[in-house]
Amino acid sequence: MNRRVHVLLGAVAIAAGIGTVRAAQAYKGSETFDAAWTIIRDSHFDPAMNGVDWPAVKAELGPRAARAQSDGELRDVIRDMLGRLGLSHFALIPSGRDNGAAAPVDLGGDPGFDVRLAGSELLVTEVDPNGGAAAAGVRPGWRLLSIDGMPIYELLSRLPETMSDRLRHVEIWRMVETRLRGPQGSQVPLMFDDGVRGVGLVVERRAETGQPATVGNLPTMYVRVDAGERRTPRGATVGVIRFNVWMPAVDPLFQDAIDKLRTADGIIVDLRGNPGGLAAMIMGISGHFLRERTPLGTMKTRDADLRFAANPRLVNAAGQRVEPYAGPLAILVDAMTGSASECFAGGMQALGRARVFGQTSMGQALPAFFAKLPNGDVLIHATGDFVTADGTRLEGRGVVPDEAIALSRADLLSGRDATLAAALKWIDQQGR
């Protein structure tokens, strides 16, 4: 499944708590709060702190941090501080559970399906054929009703009414994911609506597949690249490449896929559910589709502007001269497409090199770094802002598809991928 710094972290940061939670540390209230406040003051890309009176925030929240009686209380104060900025990529990775329990919680087992919010319904959008959910009979389009007795409507009720739809998608995914996961080999009771009736199943959590990769203090991620061919309604051959995170292990696999698809009538890069990763990789991946060194966007920091440009890939893995792919290029995105994925999709869209299909992406496109705090927690803090070559700021906006395709339960239940179908139809039209 598609789950889960130079540097763009994206929803990889959202998934940061989805792994093994380590034993708790002493909370060190004032020292930890002051360290986090100072790091942000000194590194925020906007000296005006996005319009927030930063000293006033310290004056208000500092005493609360000093009075904190547990790690959980301290984290609540720091998260309150981070929330005042109104930006993504400011977060905490706890060194232990908020309740102070010392026993580690293993969240390395995955039930093998993914979900998205459609209105007030949480729908299964994808099922791993090798996962526990597939073995139990779960199908795309089913509505998830409860996890281990916890009703989904109760989780949704915890979201603030003022929260934007874009953030609701991200937050409910995070809340659900942390409950779906658990130790490998364990089981989780789930209730679904299959479109006709309620279905209760017990699903085994299995080990994730893919090439393990680690970044900083984040849990291990598993890199997966899938590539194959599809036929358009008119019989054209289209290559479809999908990967789940921007990590170095993707590059040789992506290049191999491109080498096999150079004669295709079109290529689709599927970034649905891809939360981001290493920002610098967008320069190399885009170079498979651009002949010249072309600006993709600019990362604006407090001290400098870092320009991202496509690095044309003119030699293949065998050392042979090649031309970047010049045919039609479609990019698929959804509500869980974040960070580096947004920079790539938005950058290629702004250049007119790709057409984007799907649902508006996360709008969480800030570059971020890690800093260890005195209590052992890790602060994720944004240090720059990214704008595409045409000046479009992706933070808080997301990549808006050229062709918006609403998530439909009827499509999912029938096995139809409407976003992919729209991209295939468009590629057909380019061959006229």
PLM regions: where:
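Mature N-terminal segment immediately following signal peptide/propeptide cleavage
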Residues: 26-51
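Extended, small/polar residue-biased N-terminal targeting/export presequences
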Residues: 48-120, 183-229, 431-432
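PDZ/PDZ-like domain segments forming the peptide/carboxylate-binding groove
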Residues: 104-154, 247-248, 384-385
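N-terminal export leaders
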Residues: 3-8
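Terminal peptide-recognition signature
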Residues: 36, 81, 113, 133, ...
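Conserved PDZ fold ligand-binding element
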Residues: 135-166, 241, 268-272, 356, ...
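Cleft-lining beta-strand/loop regions that shape enzyme active-site pockets
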Residues: 182-374, 412, 426-430
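PDZ domains, with a preference for the canonical peptide-binding region formed by the helix
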Residues: 67-73, 140-189, 252-255, 281, ...
